[in-house]
Amino acid sequence: MVKITALGCGLIGHYVVERLLERGHDLSVVDINPPLPFSAEVNYIQEDALTYASSIEKQSIVLNLLPGSIGDLVRAPLLERSAIIIDLAFSAEDPDKYLEISKRTGGKMLWDIGVAPGLSNMLVAEGKRKLGDLEEVIIKVGGNPTEPDEGWSYMAPFSPSDVIEEYTRPARIVRNHKMLEVDALGDRHLIQVDGYGEMEAFLTDGLRSLLHIGGKNMAEYTVRWPGHIDKWLAEGSQMDLDDWRFDKSRKEFTWLQVKVSSADEELSWILCDEGGPDGSSMARTTGLVTAACALMAVEKPELIPEGINPPEALAVEAFDYVLKYLKNHGININ
């Protein structure tokens, strides 16, 4: 049986591990902090992930589930060990810088494998396959409580530091085929989200590898309840991160919209999930994409391309595999 190692095990990481356990796979979990209990036995290793990565068994399948601030640090050591990496760490660094290591060792990395970036990239690639040259790509995504409150109207389903990175890292967009770097939180505008009402969208740096797919005009927006960003701008520098602590008892949802258009045709997809008995909506929508790609690495390794690749590089068969896996877990994309 193939062994899988998970580096990091937060809320979403725990969900990913559970999905692999239910398929009967043998997992080791490496985290300096003991994770929540699992439904089946895992080999828990209480160790610094970076230290462990440098000595991991060669050609291991590794899930990089670490926060973005440290997730990049394990990539080179893992690739030096010829690892096959399914990478969810939302880091500022471009993993393509490790291409030479990958070529030399045979290590592989599939990066940004979540909902957005991740599934959103796969949908844009599908749009390009169907429409050809893309005039416009617009991605809007957010994970939020189902109703606003008098505070932040938000709770972080993953590392709060990664959320703050979204709000502070300059956003890269494309205008008339030129990549521009603009302030995050710009182009704020109200939108209607079916079933929830009026919400606010603002620019964030979520295009990442899609910057190179060739669209004429492209942008990614994060979606929050109105008032959230005003509060961030006024109080963010003094906030207590505990204010964003995820409350499992509170109803929440994840919503994703991807629109692509050519000169004369448009395609649009919407995903919406309110979570379930198996996990929160963000854990499900993000973690199921990660888990699907991890299962491909184990059960259909021929679907994982050589080298360092973003989600849009996956072939149609791999894209269909991910969609089927999501559907089997109750997530439909319309």
Language model region names:
Residues L20:
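Aromatic pocket-lining residues of Rossmann-like dinucleotide-binding sites
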Residues A89-W111:
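Rossmann-fold NAD(P)-binding glycine/threonine-rich loop
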Residues I4-G8:
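Conserved N-terminal Rossmann-fold NAD(P)-binding element of oxidoreductases
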Residues I45-I84, L88-K97:
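NAD(P)H-binding glycine-rich loop region in Rossmannoid oxidoreductase-like domains
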Residues I12:
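Hydrophobic/small residue at the entry helix of a nucleotide-binding pocket
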Residues K130-N334:
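C-terminal catalytic/substrate-binding lobe primarily of soluble NAD(P)-dependent oxidoreductases
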Residues H25-F38:
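NAD(P)-binding Rossmann-fold cofactor-contacting core
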